[in-house]
Amino acid sequence: MLQKLDFDNIPNFKNITETFVNPEYDPQNEYSVPYTWGTVGIIYDTTMIDIPPEEIDWDILWNEDYSDRILMFDNPRDAFAIAEIRLGYSLNTESSEELEKCADLLKEQKTVIQAYVMDEVFDKMGAGEALVAPYYAGDAVTLMDEYEDLGFVTPKSGTNLFVDALCIPAGAKQKEAAEMYINFMCEPDIAYATTSYIGYSTPNSAAFDMLDEETQNDKVSYPDSEYLNNNTTIFRNLSDEANQKMQDLWTDIKSTQDESQNKWIVPLFLVACVTLSIVIIIRRHIIRKKDVF
């Protein structure tokens, strides 16, 4: 799927901080160069959520106090990851039993969430339609720059650490040109411009040194190394069987009506029937009166 990189054409790889060299997903750094990185956390309305930031954890996404003001990821891997953390499972579990228990927990959540979202989180959190949502740190930075009442936390119980990397597909014909482009993206000023524009964290140590002190110390973009080492996990590619199991469970979760919706179906149907009956009776009465005259 990917071509091995010729690092003679990528001398700026020297700028990549040691933390992101030889990552778990590419142990020998043969196929990829990190571009940006970040964590998954919780965006929340600081004016409406009365829980101290240090106490906010994933269970808030099941909190009935914020019912119908909670958003949830609209993709299975991120949604299941949150359930996996809550249940004490690995973020890379392939156990059918554990995935099924995660699905049960996600079904329970349906009674309190407003919607499953991805990019819609920007509009809903920005407009105050929702109070809390899981999302990516880089996008949280963008949101908080625009809406000062929003905050972001990375839960103590753990989270996903993700890395966006530059790679070259196996079928690419201009491999050397692609490597030169990767090298260009690793130039300190280019990496600095990238992180400044999109809000995601940079793995480029030279670019990091160019950031202002406030950004360097911002725990949203750059959590403590102790937290990163002890409380984060990088996703691994799951087996085809585990992926299919998760997808099937997710489809079931999304298609299952929650109890709060079900309980209104019969009453609403009866009201509609009664209303329709009354309308029919009134119309017949009016028609009969017209016939008399």
Spans of model-derived segments:
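Periplasmic-binding protein-like
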Residues: 99-108, 146-170, 216
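Conserved C-terminal helix/tail region of periplasmic/extracytoplasmic solute-binding proteins
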Residues: 226-293
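A ligand-binding cleft/hinge motif common to bilobed small-molecule-binding domains
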Residues: 132-149
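Short beta-strand->loop
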Residues: 2-15, 32, 148-160, 169-172
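Sec-exported extracytoplasmic/periplasmic mature domains
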Residues: 1, 63-67, 84-88, 107, ...
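Mature extracytoplasmic/periplasmic domains
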Residues: 169-230
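Extracytoplasmic ligand-binding site segments that recognize negatively charged/polar headgroups
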Residues: 1-129
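Short, hydrophobic alpha-helical packing/hinge segments within bilobed ligand-binding/sensory domains
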Residues: 57-58, 121-124, 140, 178, ...
